[in-house]
Regions:
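Short intrinsically disordered coil segments
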Residues: 13-16, 220-227, 287, 305-309
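Extracellular hydrolytic enzyme modules, especially secreted metalloproteases
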Residues: 32, 36, 108-110, 114-285, ...
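Intrinsic-disorder/low-complexity accessory segments
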Residues: 278-329
Length: 329
């Protein structure tokens, strides 16, 4: 979606983003791969998704109309641009094609908007990339002859070339990957209260990982996410064992799991993360990654997995030095 006062960079946004999402190489950057390939790699070939792209379309107003913050610090009416985008494709798209579970509702609708996002260099009047549901906005769930739309997500087109730079480049696929992952049911792994909970840092695309490689090389999903999605079966360790030749995540290695025998909702996950494949931009961090999980369902439902306002963090890296922070990353 373009705005009345902001258009996409370049003169071929459709083909650029079709390449980024579907065909393997970003036209302007020759980076790692497409979002389609990302999900193929994460799911061991199970989740083979193609992205149908429509547009660009132009919104009725300038970007500030949709992105301006309210008194609570959040965007006031970003849902309006979703409504306008859906109006632009009405009658051109069969929404039932995107209804994966047969409930009459398109499961994911994603909007890419022109310019910067508030989370990565844009000012307060730009839209913050997010996933949400239209039932929370004044428009409510939208109904069309071929189906309903409720869940949507959005992300920005551009980012600063370097921190604080006024030179802007394509935002890559990292933020799209993160927000689309919310559509699939994955929760944030950073401290959603804005506190000092350290979460999963660069090792998780639901934390800082979508920004790896300047957004062009989002890291692999963690063992928790791949297990949660049903894409990998962990190997249980229930007695002392010697593990050799542990394959890396990028080489489709299976993670190991060790349960608390008194509470199977608490466990440790172990996986080999090497600077290869989608993990090649882990800033030199490689080796055995151990994650401590305290599975409290409400923390995932409320998107507060690693909130510092809670007594414990529920899915965090176990540091080799025993510290409770990763400020050196």
């Amino acid at each position: 979606m373009e705005f009345a006062d902001k258009t996409f960079m370049g003169d071929d946004a459709y083909n650029h983003w079709n390449a980024a999402l579907n065909t393997g190489k970003l036209i302007q950057t020759k980076e790692h791969g497409s979002l389609h390939q990302y999900f193929i790699d994460q799911s061991h070939g199970i989740f083979d998704v193609d992205f149908d792209i429509y547009g660009p379309f132009t919104a009725e107003y300038g970007y500030e109309h949709y992105g301006k913050n309210g008194n609570n610090g959040f965007d006031k009416i970003p849902g309006d641009i979703v409504v306008e985008g859906l109006k632009a494709i009405e009658g051109k798209v069969n929404l039932s094609d995107y209804d994966w579970d047969g409930d009459g509702e398109a499961d994911q609708v994603f909007f890419l908007y022109a310019g910067l996002g508030q989370a990565s260099g844009g000012h307060d009047s730009t839209i913050w990339p997010h996933e949400s549901q239209l039932r929370y906005w004044p428009c409510g769930v939208l109904k069309y002859p071929t189906g309903k739309v409720n869940t949507y997500a959005c992300a920005n087109e551009l980012q600063p070339a370097t921190q604080g730079s006024s030179n802007y480049i394509s935002a890559g696929i990292g933020t799209i990957c993160h927000e689309f992952s919310h559509c699939l049911g994955f929760a944030d792994m950073y401290d959603t209260t804005g506190g000092d909970g350290y979460g999963m840092a660069i090792f998780d695309v639901m934390d800082q990982g979508p920004y790896n490689g300047n957004g062009f090389v989002p890291c692999n999903y963690t063992a928790f996410e791949r297990i949660y999605a049903g894409w990998v079966e962990p190997i249980e360790l229930d007695s002392p064992a010697t593990v050799k030749d542990m394959k890396s995540v990028s080489d489709y290695g299976r993670p190991f799991i060790m349960y608390n025998s008194n509470n199977t909702n608490e466990y440790f996950l172990m996986e080999n993360r090497q600077n290869t494949g989608w993990d090649k931009e882990l800033y030199g961090c490689n080796g055995l990654l151990i994650v401590h999980v305290n599975y409290v369902p409400s923390r995932w439902t409320n998107n507060s997995v690693n909130a510092s306002t809670q007594e414990i963090q529920c899915c965090t890296v176990v540091n080799a030095d025993g510290s409770r922070e990763m400020s050196d990353l």
